[in-house]
Amino acid sequence: MILMGFSLLCWRKLITRIRPAEQHDVQAIASIYVDTWRSTYAGILPDKVLIEMSTERQMVMWARAIRHAGGHAEEKILIIEEEKAGIIGVSSCGFNRDRNSSYSGEVYTLYIHPNHQNNGYGEKMLAGLFEIMIDQGYNGAIIWVLSLNPSRFFYEVMKGQRIGEREEKLWGTVVREIAYGWSDLEGALESGRPQLS
């Protein structure tokens, strides 16, 4: 009986909802963004950059991004809410900013709060983005990830193919980025990874 109650509690904890981001979400989104960057990029990006990140500045940036996405059919911002914890992740997608790429869609961001990672929320968010891009007629999608970002292996688990590398300069630090691509978004959804349920 105790085990049954424990299982029910665990199942209830995973009840989630994915929806478009709205202006009243900006504080939660900004907090997730700052906390995730500080957790993920410690030792990768300069400490000064991470220390000086502020929720207030990110709120302004995300408010602008949500306004833009609301009036721009090609760009979407999604949040994921957990029943009790509230908003625990944010993601965005749209057209591939590299117009010469054979992948027409791009995942711009996918952040799950550090306290809620490794619980399947990233899979649900990625699936939600793929569904949007399928609806918009994109033939595939890419995401660029810092090579030293430990979360990049998530995209390999999600069947993303390593399709490119580049070097960028961020805050005076040269970093290497890796591109992961999915050439068949419908196939990626049907394969069971990523999946919504």
Question: For each predicted feature, which ranges?
Answer:
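Conserved N-terminal entry element of GNAT/NAT acetyltransferase domains
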Residues: 2-27, 186-197
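Acetyl-CoA-dependent GNAT
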Residues: 20-24, 34-44, 49-115, 126-128, ...
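Amphipathic alpha-helical recognition patches that constitute DNA-binding helices
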Residues: 28, 106, 140, 150
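Hydrophobic "lid"/C-terminal helical patch
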Residues: 29, 33
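Residues at secondary-structure transition points
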Residues: 49, 53, 75, 102, ...
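Conserved glycine-rich acetyl-CoA-binding loop
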Residues: 100, 109-127, 134-136, 146-153, ...
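Conserved catalytic-core motifs of GNAT/GCN5-like acyltransferases
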Residues: 142-146, 156, 161-179
